[in-house]
Amino acid sequence: MKVALMGFPLSGRTTLFDALSGGHARDGIASIPIPDPRFEALARQAGAKKITPAAFEWRDDLPDFNPDKPETARQPLSLARQSDALVCVLRAFDSPYAPYHAPIDPARDLRFWLDEYVLSDLQVIENRLERLTKLFQSHKESAADRAEHALLSRMHAALSAGESLAAFEIPSDLEARLRGFGFLTRKPMVVVANIGESLLGGEARSEMLASLQAVCTAHRLPMMSLCATFERDLRQLPESEQAEFLQMMGVAEPALPRLVRLVYEQLNLQAFYTIGDDSRAWLLRRGGTALDAAATIHSDLARGFIRAEVCHADEVLTAGGWKAAQKAGKVQLVGKDYLMRDGEVIYVRFNV
């Protein structure tokens, strides 16, 4: 799962990326494991020789652009389409050492981004509608082409009215045709207010953040505040010193795990596991089936799917391992349409 960090120059976007990656990433891309104590316990219990946690690929490789020249946003927005989720980093601190391009106003900056997403999606749809119209003129269109044109026309009307495409239901027979467009206004998004250290400790409150929260509420966007420089400095300390630093700054806990949880929730994800010498955690959209889980592991497992054995991680841990859970009758044999639950261990029976 790819998560793109969006933000103006000097918003703190790269500082946040450095905090997430520990400053060890190259080229603005970092695969960062998702904390999962349940999986860690399963891997220990199984005596795994190789342990692979689920991870998000965080990206801070989008080109900067000049906020005074919106046309320069075209390339970064085009690259953002390739991501699964967006994290919009907004500057909510002032500093003479990092002069900003305008007075500090995160609500204004968020509205700018939201408008750019709408305009960018409009351009994508207009280009596609133009190609479909030419196809119609040659009388070579299919029924699917006509259905796509009708749906895109409705989407165009919504975007022209300033609405996002988040609420649009795309028929299953058109999903594959539209997936490559990567509509920005349909992507899960988390808003991050990058505050100064003076607002650390307790719940950050200011008139500026209240205005930002109002915009987020109107657009049904989750918002959190953090201080990217503080998170980066905390991450660079030895673990033995981090608790003391948090206490000294009056901060209950690091903010980064909360950011990861928010992105996880916005992507509507759940985890499942394969355990043994090679133990792995996998990500699956909620509502995914046993067949979807098999396909996530390897296409051959889905192609030759016969049945799957599943058992919740808690029951495996309580029983003392997979074989013990089998003996205790906790393991279920399920078909391809079985709806996976968060935290299940799976073994796929297949034949190719």
Language model segments and positions:
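Conserved G1/Walker A P-loop phosphate-binding module
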Residues: 1-102, 107, 125, 132
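C-terminal-of-GTPase-core extension/linker across diverse P-loop GTPases
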Residues: 1-17, 21-22, 131-352
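Short, conserved loop/turn and helix-capping segments at secondary-structure boundaries
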Residues: 104-107, 119, 206-210
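Short, charge/polar-rich alpha-helical segments
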Residues: 111-121
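Conserved phosphate-donor/acceptor-positioning beta-strand/loop module used by diverse small-molecule
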Residues: 86-93, 116, 191-196, 225
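Charged face of amphipathic alpha-helices used as oligomerization/assembly stalks or helix-helix interfaces
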Residues: 125-126, 153
